[in-house]
Structure formats: C-alpha cells, structure tokens
C-alpha cells in the first residue's frame, strides 16, 4: 500500500510539474516572457505561487523546461537502447543528435533566441543530462564501479553545451533591432565536432570494459 501511495504521489507531482511548465510556455508565447509573472503561471496551472516555487526557481526555468520536455531522460534512454555492438562514441553521438536536432516549433525557438535570460537558462539545462547519461554509460561499460562513466557523462554534457553556445551565441552573431540572436552554422555539425574530441577517451573506456570481460 505504501508503494502505491508513493507512486500516486510521484504521478501527482509530475502532473503538477507538467501543468506548470506548459502554462509558462503558453503564457510566454502569448504575452512575451518579460510580461509573465510567476503568479500568472501558478494561477494558470491552478496552484499557489508557493507550490510553483517547489518546482521551479524562475519563470525562465519553467519556460525552458516546457521546450526541452524531459530531454535528459530521452537522451539516456536513447543511448541505452542502442545495440551492444554499436560503438559507445557512436551511440552517444546518435542519441545527442537525435534529441538536440529534432524539428522544433518555430515559435518556441524564436522565444528562446529572443531572450538572453532564456538562452542562458536553455544552456544551463544541458547539465541535467549528466546523471541519467552516466547511468546509461555505466551500463554499457558493464558497471565498472569507478568514476569513469560520471567523468565521461560530464565531458559529454560540456561538449554539448559548448556546441549549443556556439550555435546560439556566436562571437559575431547578427542581432535584430530587438536583440534577437540569429543562430548560425549547422547545429548537427557543431555537435559532431564537439563530441569528436571525446572519442579517444570513450574508445579507451570501452576497450578497457571489453578487456575485463575477456579476463
């Protein structure tokens, strides 16, 4: 019975989180992010501002959460779903490219690129892939009991953040009169280039895991 109560409680919390982030995005698209208050989001989701603060620390965090929509879990699941004979570096690159370059709603992308605060928050969310990705990498390496998977996951997250930063905040990014940053370059190419720098470390970790299995 306790397990069932815990499951129902978690489902309710997740439903509240989804309601808040969807309300935040809906209001931001309608009014512009600068014209949305936390109280507005809470009211639209049918909860109190205090409840809102249990889930998100800012309006930007809620808006970006709606745009990314559990991406960290999807990246890890995608890595775990790759066949065992697929090279680890390839499995990671395929999963990252799949989840970060999927077709986006034009209005949502415009919302992110038009706001410096939303751009920064969007980049900060990349760190959320570390924990689930470390678990997926550790599973593929055969549960080594070492920090290897965590170090690799942190490195992948850093590479993804740098690629996104280059895409969203290039040094000479053209600006519109409203301050809108126009993304430049190919995001898939930027991601591939950043992740390629990690291939030697990923290959070495995978080779060590295979050697342990052969012993």
Cite the ranges covered by each PLM segment.
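Basic, helix-initiating cap at the start of DNA-binding domains
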Residues: 1-31, 35-44, 74
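Amphipathic alpha-helical segments enriched in hydrophobic/aromatic and basic residues
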Residues: 28, 37, 59-67, 71, ...
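Short, well-structured alpha-helical segments
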Residues: 93, 149-157, 161, 188
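C-terminal peripheral helix-coil segments that are non-catalytic and often amphipathic
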Residues: 135, 169-215
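HTH DNA-binding helix-turn interface
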Residues: 7, 31-33, 46, 53-64
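Short secondary-structure transition hinges
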Residues: 73, 103-132, 138
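Hydrophobic alpha-helical connector segments
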Residues: 73-108
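Hydrophobic alpha-helical bundle segments that form small-molecule/ligand-binding pockets
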Residues: 101, 127-153, 170
């Amino acid at each position: 019975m306790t397990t069932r109560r815990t499951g129902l409680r978690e489902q309710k919390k997740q439903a509240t989180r989804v309601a808040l982030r969807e309300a935040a995005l809906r209001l931001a698209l309608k009014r512009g992010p600068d014209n949305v208050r936390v109280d507005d989001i809470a009211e639209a989701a049918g909860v109190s501002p205090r409840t809102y603060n249990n889930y998100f620390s800012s309006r930007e965090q809620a808006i970006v959460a709606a745009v990314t929509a559990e991406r960290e879990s999807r990246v890890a699941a995608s890595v775990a779903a790759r066949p065992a004979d697929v090279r680890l570096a390839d499995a990671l690159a395929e999963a990252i490219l799949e989840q970060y370059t999927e077709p986006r709603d034009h209005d949502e992308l415009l919302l992110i690129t038009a706001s410096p605060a939303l751009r920064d928050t969007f980049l900060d969310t990349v760190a959320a892939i570390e924990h689930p990705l470390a678990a997926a990498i550790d599973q593929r390496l055969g549960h080594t009991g070492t920090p290897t998977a965590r170090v690799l996951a942190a490195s992948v997250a850093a590479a993804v953040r740098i690629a996104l930063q280059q895409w969203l905040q290039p040094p000479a990014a053209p600006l519109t009169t409203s301050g809108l940053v126009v993304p430049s370059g190919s995001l898939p190419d930027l991601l591939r280039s950043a992740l390629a720098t990690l291939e030697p470390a990923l290959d070495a970790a995978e080779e060590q895991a295979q050697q342990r299995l052969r012993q």
